[in-house]
Structure formats: structure tokens, C-alpha cells
Amino acid sequence: MKVRASVKPICSKCKVVRRKGIVRIICENPKHKQKQG
């Protein structure tokens, strides 16, 4: 899980999800998981 100020989809399978006001990226590739913080 990468914590970044700006989260961007890395590949075509990355999806942007908002949970409780936190922007997350979920993907099949675990390296692409991101969280805004």
C-alpha cells in the first residue's frame, strides 16, 4: 500500500474507490494499491 498526496491509476485495471472520504486505488496487482493521506 502506497500512501500518496496524489493517487493516480497506474494501469487499466486500477479502480478509484472512495471509502469514508478516503480515496483509494484497488487493482489486481498488489503493487498498485494506493491510499491518499
Swiss-Prot record:
Transferase listed as a keyword: no
Protein family (similarity comment): Belongs to the bacterial ribosomal protein bL36 family.
Superkingdom field: Bacteria
GO BP terms, alphabetized: translation
Taxon lineage: Bacteria, Pseudomonadati, Thermodesulfobacteriota, Desulfuromonadia, Desulfuromonadales
Keywords carried by this UniProt record: Ribonucleoprotein, Ribosomal protein
Protein's name according to its UniProt entry: Large ribosomal subunit protein bL36
GO CC term (a single one): ribosome
Pfam family, one: Ribosomal_L36
Gene: rpmJ
NCBIfam families: rpmJ_bact
SUPFAM superfamilies (alphabetical): Ribosomal protein L36
InterPro entries for the chain: Ribosomal_bL36, Ribosomal_bL36_sp
GO MF annotations in UniProt: structural constituent of ribosome
